[in-house]
Amino acid sequence: MASPGQESVHDLIVVGGGPAGVMAGLLFARAGCDVLVLEKHADFFRDFRGDTVHPSTMEILDQLGMLGRFLERPHNRLYEARGTISGKDYVLGDLRHLRTPAPFIAMMPQWDFLDFMRDEAEIYPGFALAMDSPVASFLEEKERVAGVRLKDGRELRARLTIAADGRSSLARTLLPVENLGAPMDVFWFRVP
């Protein structure tokens, strides 16, 4: 990555080092691209973001040849969803019948999952992850996004910029893009 005052050019910049951003970086680096993933936080260990890796995600990891290494990491397995209704316990869902390489939910904190994804992505020479690199704005040229400007003033250019910056997306705030919504939402809360 360039120093302040220097320009950096990449095939691809991904804004956001969460699961979607790191996975995008991994896939493009695997395809031979020069990829820079930018994460605003100094590390992945931050506020609660989730702790489940679902069978469909593990199926993708299997297709990429990564599932075995993923399952070597510490995790717990949830095969059933159970609930208590009017004092009686019920099995609400049983994943064991799924025709997938991992018919369970892997319970793993998101920061551990992101460490795994980063480790896998760093196998590819074109992958770089820059922590503590908050984006201030997007560089626009000829009606296209040409890169980003970091809060420290550095300008990083790319042939393609992907916004994977999550719920509080800077991209949706700064760029003239329409928010199409989502078919579902999740309500997160803390129990004291």
Q: Model-found features: residue ranges?
A:
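A conserved short coil-to-beta-strand element within the FAD-binding core of flavoproteins
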Residues: 131-145
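Short hydrophobic core segments
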Residues: 15, 155-166
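Active-site-adjacent segment of FAD-dependent monooxygenases/related oxidoreductases
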Residues: 54-120
